[in-house]
Amino acid sequence: MKKTAIALLAWFVSSASLAATPWQKITHPVPGAAQSIGSFANGCIIGADTLPVQSDNYQVMRTDQRRYFGHPDLVMFIQRLSHQAQQRGLGTVLIGDMGMPAGGRFNGGHASHQTGLDVDIFLQLPKTRWSQAQLLRPQALDLVSRDGKHVVPSRWSSDIASLIKLAAQDNDVTRIFVNPAIKQQLCLDAGNDRDWLRKVRPWFQHRAHMHVRLRCPADSLECEDQPLPPPGDGCGAELQSWFEPPKPGTTKPEKKTPPPLPPSCQALLDEHVL
């Protein structure tokens, strides 16, 4: 478990040591009406909002990385979710990476988070607020067993499940990525109220946080939405396939060259960086 915790911490801080991308040279949001452009893994944003770092309901981690920008819809979602969590006595919501001031590609750690519609939220809800030192170097709490087959009972709580459910029930949310073991636990605990589980999608890693994705805003005409998740709660064969051993001969896919930017994003870079 210690090795896994170290690996998680390394994953959260590794991006600081990698070569910068052109998008990191844009230090303030691009003025204009808010527009998410392109796809979640190949896009940008005009008119991003800054998430206020001071709030009674949430705390923002790693503010030195300046990844607390997003579409106004994302900022409002975070404020809405954290207010609901506070009303229910769940604890302080810990906000991780959103996006950069103009969106675009990160130098590591994320393939998406490019259009201002994604946010990582820690799956721990402290009852006392974290210090500035804790926020700058957050300790991820690994909720998943070493073999990846189930959550760690001593670390899992109904409050965590409630936070994920609250996020999934938000009308602006289309997907929430969590580790397969976390999805499995949610399936076991959900009871008869299961419609929200459709949005909770199993994905690699995500052992200590959930990755929340919003739908494209109606007035962002160049934003590319994903297809909706398949019908149903996603607790059947699809989920179980994540726990099966890899088929013989299965290899990791090779890293692909990033696709060309959407023309509007390339024009934005040309004007503000290149």
Curated annotation (Swiss-Prot):
Disulfide bonds join C44-C265, C187-C235, C216-C223. SUPFAM superfamilies: Hedgehog/DD-peptidase. Pfam families: Peptidase_M74. Keywords: Disulfide bond, Hydrolase, Metal-binding, Metalloprotease, Periplasm, Protease, Signal, Zinc. Binds 2 Zn(2+) ions per subunit. Zn(2+) ion 1 is bound in the active site. Zn(2+) ion 2 is bound at the dimer interface by residues from both subunits. Its cofactor is Zn(2+). Its main location: periplasm. Zn(2+) 2 binds at D147, H150. Its EC number is 3.4.24.-. Belongs to the peptidase M74 family. Dimer. Murein endopeptidase that cleaves the D-alanyl-meso-2,6-diamino-pimelyl amide bond that connects peptidoglycan strands. Likely plays a role in the removal of murein from the sacculus. This is Penicillin-insensitive murein endopeptidase. It comes from Salmonella typhimurium (strain LT2 / SGSC1412 / ATCC 700720). The lineage of its organism: Bacteria, Pseudomonadati, Pseudomonadota, Gammaproteobacteria, Enterobacterales.
